[in-house]
Amino acid sequence: MRYDSPLAAVGNTPLVRLPRLSPSADVRIWAKLEDRNPTGSVKDRPALHMIEQAEKDGRLTPGCTILEPTSGNTGISLAMAAKLKGYRIVCVMPENTSQERRDLLAMWGAEIISSPAAGGSNTAVRVAKELSAEHPDWVMLYQYGNPDNAGAHYATTGPEILADLPSVTHFVAGLGTTGTLMGVGRYLREHKPDVKIVAAEPRYDDLVYGLRNLDEGFVPELYDASVLTTRFSVGSADAVTRTRELLQQEGIFAGVSTGAALHAAIGVGRKAVKAEETADIVFVVADGGWKYLSTGVYTAATTEEAIERLQGQLWA
């Protein structure tokens, strides 16, 4: 398919059935391959949508500086769009993010301000808000509270899923900013009320890379509990195990947060098998694994070794 710009190539990603990881012939798991977006992650959708809506609203004009707290993917997506549209961008990142993410941000011209590792992305948000107060002419799009984050998925991801798989019964995504869950969830619920919306959420006081537990003190402003059917608890070992299985059994090379979503999808699928139900379960492959090669998680001999290698790194 032909496009005039990488920005025009955002979205319309493949939906792929996973025959080896699906629990049964009647309970099928489908992967929405968001790693096929131009910068390799689902965040291309909200990044572009937030910028374009800010332009329409007159908040973002030529010569403006974009400010965003991020631990990687959203910043990378915003940096790519900012580069093409001619904006300066400043990203506040926790100091313990993977080197690949820092290199990618710098490659697209982003200026990086490091926030303390303690507190992770929550601390990055605080630092960014302080910078915003100091520089009122900077435009902080703020993915955690910007309705255009969820709006991107309501306008694109949700319709794509329903068009490709009218029989969809469940939608599963990792719980981060909650933009994907809120946007897709609202769209699917409006057009197919029986669809179940499932959030893959880390266990309390456990680190699942790329996700957050809502009970640990920071609830994104976008979050609306009424959109979800359930929150599925996932441990770090579960996420790493499923990430490695996805590569080894289905050939999909994804980031660790995707493993958490897959674990929840498999759990939902097993319940459907036990209840003798038919199900088509869609989960989001949020990004590709190539951004995390330096961690060694994919080449470790065992899951335990992979988890040990990940200690101290932030992937949100």
PLM regions and their residue ranges:
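PLP-dependent amino-acid enzyme catalytic core
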Residues: 1-316
